[in-house]
Amino acid sequence: MPLTESIKFIDLFAGIGGIRIPFDELGYKCVFSSEWDKNACKTYIANFGDIPAGDITKIKEQDIPPHDILLAGFPCQAFSIMGKMQGFNDTRGTMFFEIERILAYHKPKAILLENVKQLTTHDHGNTFKVILQKLSQLGYHVKYQVLNALDFGLPQKRERIIIVGFLDKFDSEKFNFDFEKKDYNLASILEDETKIPANFYASEKIRQKRLDFTSDKIKFFPSVWHENKSGNISILDYSCALRTGASYNYLLVNGERRFTPRELLRLQGFPDSYKIVVSTQEIRRQTGNSVAVPMIRMVAQKIDSILRSKENGATSETQRFKETYGKRVISA
């Protein structure tokens, strides 16, 4: 059986499946997913055909199938600036301990965790220290790094910490976060302006007000105008990090309109084949909660390379053993 067909993974706090996509591309098999949000589940089912289990806190670890890799973009609101950085004082922050109990029971070969970069500094670094200690106590050798979606060809400044761990120390030593940065291009994710529905555009009055407010600023196209609640506007060639709240109202393509659902998915690196089955408002929330797919793809491919080389190495050792001792038996 090919290695990819034998590798199984679980997708915790799955959202709309952004972390899963690169592992599906590798041919790995998802044997369990968990997501409690009904609309996210609707999107997940439409795109992957699997029905996620509900609230992970109510699922016994022994009811989760055996797996080789655990994936989890565990809830980040408790650690984010927008979420007031409550950390483990927020029930969403304690979701890490759900991961811990599953790891303790199943001991998968590898783990990939994703969260906001503020996780590393929350409570003066103590929260992150606890997480690393727990993973170490479970036998995982961990590496981590803050990565930016901009460096993966996406016109979105989205910084996230990626944590990768292996039970095998030698596997961990082989892993690194080295990658070749890619240029981003805002135009590449924008839809044809002639096909944008009229309700995505601001009124002429509001658009003129923005033009007047930015009369002293250099304007270029395409661009994203970032307008804060005070009305201050920054004009950039990329978007700030997509969020789940109302901030999408202040991300304006060329200062004229909001991003479309397809553009929001493209900002996260989702393929155009990805189905949209919920409202525009829901897609805004779901993409704000999701991940930069190309970022995860880079990490997934590195994990795959290590597991594949290990499998090939084991096969080579077995073959050498047979050749060596087989000859001795024959000569005897």
Where do the model's predicted regions map?
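Short, histidine-centered active-site or binding-site loop motifs used for metal coordination
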Residues: 83, 115-117, 246, 280
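Conserved short-loop catalytic and cofactor-binding motifs
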Residues: 87, 116-119, 151, 255, ...
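S-adenosyl-L-methionine-dependent DNA methyltransferase catalytic core
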Residues: 1-30, 66, 134-146, 156, ...
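Core alpha/beta nucleotide-donor-binding catalytic domains of modification enzymes
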Residues: 2-110, 117-129
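Short, solvent-exposed coil/turn elements at secondary-structure transition points
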Residues: 57-62, 148-150, 273
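Conserved Class I SAM-dependent methyltransferase catalytic core
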Residues: 94-157, 161-166
